[in-house]
Amino acid sequence: MKYDLVGIDGNAFNIISYVMSAMKECGFSTSDRNDYFKEATSSDYSNLIVISDEMINRCNEIADDVLISKL
């Protein structure tokens, strides 16, 4: 697992920045990153955490696939 929200400062802006950086590293388009931002900020902090965790899981799946393909 390359990406993890555990250990990240719990400030909402830090979480969003971390997730968006992970998405960029994984090749997500600007449009995808903007969609994440809109969804993550559409409600309360709990929503932000749920949406961010789901996206980090997707990023980890992509990172794992890339790692496996290099073996």
PLM ranges: what are they?
Residues 1-71:
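Long, contiguous binding/interaction regions
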